[in-house]
């Protein structure tokens, strides 16, 4: 399970955090009493009030002045309810971020026209990564803070409140100091993480600091204590301006105007990636949204766009090769694992190595935190099960089929001419086996004729109750005439069912189909092989394709048009583009011996599996001239098998000589024997014998049409299809998205093991821990409730986006009321409650997400790069929208929208100063002695983390002092 491991420094910091509000609360009680005695009138400004105001949704808990015990009870209820609401917001934000991931993963197809006129298609993402991070991604991670500010203003008659703005500033401080401090510390010792897109980081950091400086300017400089309409609107419009500036920096549009850009397809899912290059020498066109754009003429995207098609193909091939390499390594590392487990491991490894968005890490952190399990491992396991199930499709008749199916066991049968009879098996599957089923059969001529080649047969087969298999026999007529192989057909027809329910025992034809019918195959083909010829020897086909993963390839050599006598057929392999000697296949040669009446033999060749994604190599398998085994050779072979005789290759008196070996290790004088032929070769032949010899010559074995088989070794179909499926399924939007409500409800009620993300492999399935069960049961209400949110599959994620943000708004309204009532119950001001408790609660999922991103990602962008952008968006959207609405409302009524500059202006100024220190330290850490913003030597990590935690504690400390008038603000 993912845990937030904190150093002693962090532990001390959080203990101080809990102590500070209580300290000031106690001090304020004393000062409040003193001021009341001295008729002070500033207690409302400088102390927390114990009198609560009606919330946007929640009413006031009466009576307003409870006893000390009741205050503790009320504070506990408010605090627990607030924490539970934070859990709910985290879970619905998980759905919200899933929809954002799906939306920003949308692609469009473009057509590339090559110089030779050929066209090819590829896909590009619609959303720019930087734009999506600053808009939808930032909105997703900061939605509670933004909505809290808007709801607070709108819910309190468009008057300014402390909770929303203070939450935004407090959340920004927590993100800037605590989250970055944690990310610096959790990177393993000696490792570093750098920000990849430094230009974008500079722009967003500058805008983040400017955003809070701008708040100070409009509150304390331009129009102190009043927010005018143009100030609110300009604050809001800074948001799209910030996005444009970040996009310009990302695209290098201002600084690299005249640097020609070259575009190639990325390794992940055919995405187009930009890199700088020389002016193109050839003309390339690209079609987007149905229009062909000539990059040489139109200077597409402020640079000459060159879509290097060859390089794109190479990168696609490289991605597949990488996937194939991973599968091969896993197979070698885990030879005992099944294909499902190997696919799961490969899928998880590829997804783990893939660059991930901020949304993904936020979703992953929330699900691990709430007992929903590791989404990467769950997705990998699901895909593996689906992939294996695709290979295990069973086409047989289901046993629970209500209709009985009657069919032949196989569609083709073979027999020799001298076999006497051929047996055909009829099967019965499914339906009610207590019924009696009748089925008619009859033979039909093919190339074989009834009466001369086989016996015409017809009849009825009866399946009694419980019987599932029957056998019928057809007589085969033998003759001594050389003839081609012939065939005839056997048909099934007229299925009838008998049951006790029917009056006459036989059901009517129009009722039979509901109980029994013919299955497939209902016709069998019987081939009769002639046995009067020694045979024609051939391969089944001239070319065969085999998978390199086949291992031992077996090739059939057929003996047609006769099967009389013993025949030896030599064979050998011949190299083509495939090499023998164990490189692509093992060289094979030998002889096949067909016994009398034997019609099929197999040749085995070992194919070497080197698991290439694409392979197309050939070799040949050739059979030589067949020869009849003469009587002497036949006897020698028999003696060799039984008694250890070998052929010497010598002749005595015209007869072959055989040597019997008594012992191989200690030879003794051998015995030489001769076997005389039954006939004398020198004796003249009679006319009858001459005719017999002529007939015998006609019946000698010969080669058929296909004597040289071309074997094409291809990549393993299973291996290739597995790689292709993994390539298609490595889209993170598919991992975090959902397709149906059923899937969402199953996921909501299922508790999964939250395994450590440090694991490189899935390993064996683990059971959920006690912590997983506790968190699951604490959050199961929210999980089931938010399972009603539309799946991300609908409207390309927009349906889920809209419903989720409405849900977040409702929960945020409850959180605002609970936080305000909690603060007033214990005497804390809203500004302090917001900075400490609400900001912490809304930032916990981001803390987990950044921790995971810091340890898993190659760069620091996903962990801290979005912090600065998110802070700027919080101000421009959260405060800009809320204050614009309120300023317009008051201006329409002829009033001014007044905002007290004191606490907020002080907090903003303090945060801005500390933020400069934070960014300066991060940039200094890029020096070679440390190597990056995150990680580095242990001493440097500790010093940096301690400094950032100290900055945050100082921010909380001074903000609280100012809020309670212990120091003077602005």
UniProtKB/Swiss-Prot annotation:
Residues 33-71, 155-167, 223-228, 819-821, 893-903, 963-970 are extracellular. It comes from the Eukaryota. Residues 393-493, 524-624 form the Calx-beta domain. The modification Phosphoserine is found at residues 282, 389. GO terms for cellular component: axon; plasma membrane; postsynapse; sarcolemma. Keywords: Antiport, Calcium, Calcium transport, Calmodulin-binding, Cell membrane, Glycoprotein, Ion transport, Membrane, Metal-binding, Phosphoprotein, Repeat, Signal, Sodium, Sodium transport, Transmembrane, Transmembrane helix, Transport. Residues 93-133, 189-201, 250-797, 843-871, 925-941 are cytoplasmic. Disulfide bonds: none annotated. Ca(2+) 3 binds at residues 417, 479, 481, 483, 530, 532. Coiled coil: none annotated. Ca(2+) 4 binds at residues 453, 479, 483, 486. InterPro entries: CaCA, CalX-like_sf, Calx_beta, DnaJ_domain, Na_Ca_Ex, Na_Ca_Ex_C-exten, NaCa_exhngr1, NaCa_Exmemb. The chain crosses the membrane at residues 72-92, 134-154, 168-188, 202-222, 229-249, 798-818, 822-842, 872-892, 904-924, 942-962. Alpha- repeats lie at residues 138-178, 839-875. Activated by micromolar levels of Ca(2+). Ca(2+) 1 binds at residues 417, 453, 479, 483. It is a multi-pass membrane protein. One of its GO terms (biological process) is cell communication. Mediates the exchange of one Ca(2+) ion against three to four Na(+) ions across the cell membrane, and thereby contributes to the regulation of cytoplasmic Ca(2+) levels and Ca(2+)-dependent cellular processes. Contributes to Ca(2+) transport during excitation-contraction coupling in muscle. In a first phase, voltage-gated channels mediate the rapid increase of cytoplasmic Ca(2+) levels due to release of Ca(2+) stores from the endoplasmic reticulum. SLC8A1 mediates the export of Ca(2+) from the cell during the next phase, so that cytoplasmic Ca(2+) levels rapidly return to baseline. Belongs to the Ca(2+):cation antiporter (CaCA) (TC 2.A.19) family. SLC8 subfamily. This is Sodium/calcium exchanger 1. It comes from Felis catus (Cat).
């Amino acid at each position: 399970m993912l845990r937030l491991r904190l150093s002693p420094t962090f532990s001390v910091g959080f203990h101080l955090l809990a102590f500070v509000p209580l300290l000031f609360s106690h001090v304020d009680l004393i000062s409040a009493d003193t001021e009341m005695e001295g008729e002070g009138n500033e207690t409302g400004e400088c102390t927390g009030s114990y009198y609560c105001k009606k919330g946007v949704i929640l009413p006031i808990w009466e009576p307003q002045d409870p006893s000390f015990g009741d205050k503790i009870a009320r504070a506990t209820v408010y605090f627990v309810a607030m924490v539970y609401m934070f859990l709910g917001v985290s879970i619905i934000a998980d759905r919200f971020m899933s929809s954002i991931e799906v939306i920003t993963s949308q692609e469009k197809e473009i057509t590339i026209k090559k110089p030779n006129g050929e066209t090819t298609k590829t896909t590009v993402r619609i959303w720019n990564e930087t734009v999506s991070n600053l808009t939808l991604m930032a909105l997703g991670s900061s939605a509670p803070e933004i909505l809290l500010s808007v709801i607070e203003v709108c819910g309190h008659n468009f008057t300014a409140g402390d909770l929303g703005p203070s939450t935004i500033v407090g959340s920004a401080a927590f993100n800037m100091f605590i989250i970055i401090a944690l990310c610096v510390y959790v990177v393993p010792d000696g490792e570093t993480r750098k920000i990849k897109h430094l230009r974008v980081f500079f722009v967003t950091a500058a805008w983040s600091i400017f955003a809070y400086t701008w708040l100070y300017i409009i509150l304390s400089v331009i129009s102190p204590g009043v927010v005018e309409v143009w100030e609110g609107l300009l604050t809001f419009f800074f948001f799209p301006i910030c996005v444009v500036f970040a996009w310009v920096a990302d695209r290098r549009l201002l600084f690299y105007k005249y640097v020609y850009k070259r575009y190639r397809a990325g390794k992940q899912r055919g995405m187009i990636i930009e890199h700088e290059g020389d002016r193109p020498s050839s003309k390339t066109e690209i079609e987007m949204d149905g229009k062909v754009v000539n990059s040489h003429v139109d200077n597409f995207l402020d640079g000459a766009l060159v879509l290097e098609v060859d390089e794109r193909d190479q990168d696609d091939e490289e991605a597949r090769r990488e996937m194939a390499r991973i599968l091969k390594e896993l197979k070698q590392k885990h030879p005992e694992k099944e294909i499902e487990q190997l696919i799961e491991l490969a899928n998880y490894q590829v997804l783990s190595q893939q660059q991930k968005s901020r949304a993904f890490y936020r979703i992953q952190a929330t699900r691990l935190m709430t007992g929903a399990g590791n989404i990467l491992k769950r997705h990998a396991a699901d895909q593996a099960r689906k992939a294996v199930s695709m290979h295990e499709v069973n086409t047989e008749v289901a046993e629970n089929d209500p209709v009985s199916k009657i069919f032949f066991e196989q569609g083709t049968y073979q027999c020799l001419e001298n076999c006497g009879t051929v047996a055909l098996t009829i099967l019965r599957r499914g339906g009610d086996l207590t019924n009696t089923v009748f089925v008619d059969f009859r033979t039909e001529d093919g190339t074989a004729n009834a009466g001369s080649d086989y016996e015409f047969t017809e009849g009825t087969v009866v399946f009694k109750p419980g019987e599932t298999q029957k056998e019928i026999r057809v007589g085969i007529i033998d003759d001594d005439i050389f003839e081609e192989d012939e065939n005839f057909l056997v048909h099934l027809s007229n299925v009838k069912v008998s049951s006790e329910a029917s009056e006459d025992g036989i059901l009517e034809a129009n009722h039979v189909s509901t109980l029994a019918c013919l299955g497939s195959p209902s016709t069998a083909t019987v081939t009769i092989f002639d046995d009067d010829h020694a045979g024609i020897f051939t391969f089944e086909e001239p070319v065969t394709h085999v998978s390199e993963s086949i291992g031992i390839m077996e090739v059939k050599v057929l003996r047609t048009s006769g099967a009389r006598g013993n025949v030896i057929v030599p064979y050998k392999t011949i190299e083509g583009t495939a090499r023998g000697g164990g490189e692509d296949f093992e060289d094979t040669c030998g002889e096949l011996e067909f016994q009398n009446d034997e019609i099929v033999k197999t040749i085995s060749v070992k194919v070497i599996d080197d698991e290439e994604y694409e392979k197309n190599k050939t070799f040949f398998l050739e059979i030589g001239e067949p020869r009849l085994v003469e009587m002497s050779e036949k006897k020698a072979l028999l003696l060799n098998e039984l008694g250890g005789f070998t052929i010497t290759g010598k002749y005595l008196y015209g007869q072959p000589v055989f040597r019997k070996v008594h012992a191989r290790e200690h030879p003794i004088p051998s015995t030489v024997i001769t076997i005389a032929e039954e006939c004398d070769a020198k004796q003249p032949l009679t006319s009858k014998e001459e005719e017999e010899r002529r007939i015998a010559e006609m019946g000698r074995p010969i080669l058929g049409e296909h004597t040289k088989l071309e074997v094409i070794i291809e990549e393993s179909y299973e291996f290739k299809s597995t790689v292709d499926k993994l390539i298609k399924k490595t889209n993170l939007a598919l991992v975090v998205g959902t397709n149906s409500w059923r899937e969402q409800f199953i996921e909501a009620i299922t508790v999964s093991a939250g395994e450590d993300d440090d694991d490189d492999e899935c390993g064996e399935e683990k059971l959920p821990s006690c912590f997983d069960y506790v968190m699951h049961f604490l959050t199961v209400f929210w999980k089931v409730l938010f399972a009603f949110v539309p799946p991300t599959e609908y409207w390309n994620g927009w349906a889920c986006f809209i419903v989720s943000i409405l849900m977040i708004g409702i929960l945020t309204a409850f959180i605002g009321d609970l936080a305000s009532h909690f603060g007033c119950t214990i005497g804390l001001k809203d500004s302090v409650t917001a900075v400490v408790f609400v900001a912490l609660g809304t930032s916990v999922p981001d803390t987990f997400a950044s921790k995971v991103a810091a340890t898993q990602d190659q760069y620091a962008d996903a962990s801290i790069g979005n912090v600065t952008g998110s802070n700027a968006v919080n101000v421009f959207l959260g405060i800009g929208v809320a204050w614009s609405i309120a300023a317009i409302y008051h201006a329409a009524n002829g009033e001014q929208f007044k905002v007290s500059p004191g606490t907020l202006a002080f907090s903003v100024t303090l945060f801005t100063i500390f933020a400069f220190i934070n960014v300066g330290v991060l940039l200094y850490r890029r020096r070679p002695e440390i190597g990056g913003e995150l990680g580095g030597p242990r001493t440097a990590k500790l010093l940096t983390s301690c400094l950032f935690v100290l900055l945050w504690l100082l921010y909380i400390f001074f903000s609280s002092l100012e809020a309670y008038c212990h120091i003077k603000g602005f």
